[in-house]
């Protein structure tokens, strides 16, 4: 359903094949949550004990769970332009993005109190962050995707620098 909706909005590349929970279990080589398990406890246990083998469908070169900076920016635009999405959907998406806990990319060098709603992406050798900086002149859309990284830390640092430069240019 989500891929049909994305295609209807004109997204030619963006595809989603699983939710975050499914991807985590896939990463750990587990197809699903065991019946009767507490999902949070099971995810915590898997993350602490599972070997880091990157062969699941999240890493397959099949065009699944992919997007482009252009399409991600178009999606962000839908969140800031009133009337493009139902208000309830827009408000809920922005609320989730404002609570993003990964802070080592776009927000890293922003001054305290600067509002940012963003979504990160990470797999070995790839770092992404796409977000909306809410600045006095108006919202600024920022999308940074880096790949083929020898150092994931260097990729995160580059995106953090982009966040700083965008803030300086538009604040």
List each language-model region with its residue ranges.
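Mid-domain, small-residue-enriched loop/turn segments at the edges of structured enzyme/sensor domains
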Residues: 1-76
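Structured C-terminal helix/loop/strand segments within mature extracytoplasmic catalytic/sensor domains
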Residues: 57, 61-171
């Amino acid at each position: 359903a989500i891929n049909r909706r994305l295609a209807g909005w004109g997204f030619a590349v963006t595809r989603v094949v699983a939710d975050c929970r499914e991807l985590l279990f896939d990463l750990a080589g587990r197809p699903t949550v065991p019946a009767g398990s507490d999902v949070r406890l099971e995810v915590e246990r898997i993350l602490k004990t599972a070997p880091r083998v990157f062969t699941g469908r999240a890493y397959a070169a099949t065009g699944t769970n992919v997007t482009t900076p252009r399409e991600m920016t178009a999606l962000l635009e839908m969140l800031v332009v009133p009337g493009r999405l139902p208000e309830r959907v827009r408000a809920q998406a922005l609320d989730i993005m404002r609570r993003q806990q990964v802070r080592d990319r776009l927000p890293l060098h922003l001054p305290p109190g600067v509002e940012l709603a963003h979504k990160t992406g990470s797999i070995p050798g790839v770092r992404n962050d796409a977000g909306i900086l809410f600045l006095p002149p108006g919202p600024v859309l920022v999308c940074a995707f880096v790949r083929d990284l020898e150092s994931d830390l260097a990729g995160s640092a580059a995106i953090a620098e982009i966040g700083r430069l965008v803030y300086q240019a538009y604040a």
